[in-house]
Regions:
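A short beta-strand submotif of the Rossmann-like class I SAM-dependent methyltransferase core
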Residues: 85-91
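Redox-cofactor binding/interface segments in oxidoreductases and associated redox assembly factors
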Residues: 36, 88, 117
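S-adenosyl-L-methionine-dependent methyltransferase catalytic module, highlighting the catalytic core
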Residues: 96-100, 104, 114-209
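Surface-exposed loop/turn positions
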Residues: 32, 112-113
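Conserved N-terminal segment of class I S-adenosyl-L-methionine
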Residues: 1-81, 85, 201-204
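Short, solvent-exposed loop/turn segments at secondary-structure junctions
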Residues: 40-44, 59-61, 72, 93, ...
Length: 210
């Protein structure tokens, strides 16, 4: 119960049509060492003030990553306490041991370092047909409280509310790409309380501090 109380819930991204990555770009300082796991910030690199950006992935995609590394395995000593900011967008659902992955991410963060991420909750299956990576897990707000229990602070940002979440599943891919851009999801979810929207959502952005 104390872990759940420790978690701050912020409904900003249910009520505003804004990319969470904008917040990440704004938070990164010019002298920060940054690790992007899965390269979820790839199209934002030119907007990031710091140029000390390292990319990591379990697969080799040719032009990235800088380091091929399974985050469920022990990190190289050169990566320990190296990074001020770590970004992990839509990755933890694809690893076979998210608890071990988070433990290793914490080891790579400097003291007071910050982890930014996203995980799905009520969301459709989305492993590629090639099975280059798999789709293992979904995370409720309570799961995130426990997953990040060893961090100083946890703030989670629900994505989509109780009404727009099933529509996103029903119109998989098309909802986000076309319909959601009109802002109709914000209008629909206004008919539901903040609490219900935060509990019956598509997924969560999160910011946790070591």
């Amino acid at each position: 119960i104390e872990l759940i109380k420790k978690t701050k819930i912020n409904n900003y991204y249910i009520k505003n049509q804004e990319d969470f990555r904008k917040r990440i770009v704004e938070d990164i300082n010019i002298d920060d060492d940054v690790l992007d796991i899965g390269k979820g910030m790839r199209d934002k690199f030119e907007n990031i003030k710091s140029k000390n950006i390292t990319t990591v992935d379990v697969n080799d995609f040719g032009d990235y990553p800088d380091i091929i590394y399974d985050i469920c395995s022990d990190p190289d000593e050169t990566l320990l306490k190296k990074f001020d900011k770590i970004v992990c967008l839509a990755v933890l659902e694809h690893v076979y041991d998210p608890f071990l992955a988070v433990k290793n991410i914490k080891l790579m963060l400097k003291e007071n370092g910050v982890l930014y991420g996203y995980v799905p909750y009520l969301f459709y299956y989305h492993a590629p047909r090639s099975l280059k990576f798999q789709d293992y897990f979904r995370f409720s707000k309570d799961a995130l409280s426990y997953l990040f229990k060893d961090f100083k602070s946890i703030e989670i940002f629900p994505i989509r509310g109780r009404i727009s979440t099933p529509l996103n599943i029903l119109f998989a891919g098309r909802w986000k790409k076309y319909i959601e851009k009109t802002g109709i999801n914000i209008l629909l979810d206004k008919f539901v309380s903040d609490t219900k929207n935060s509990e019956q959502c598509s997924g969560y952005n999160f910011i946790v501090k070591k």
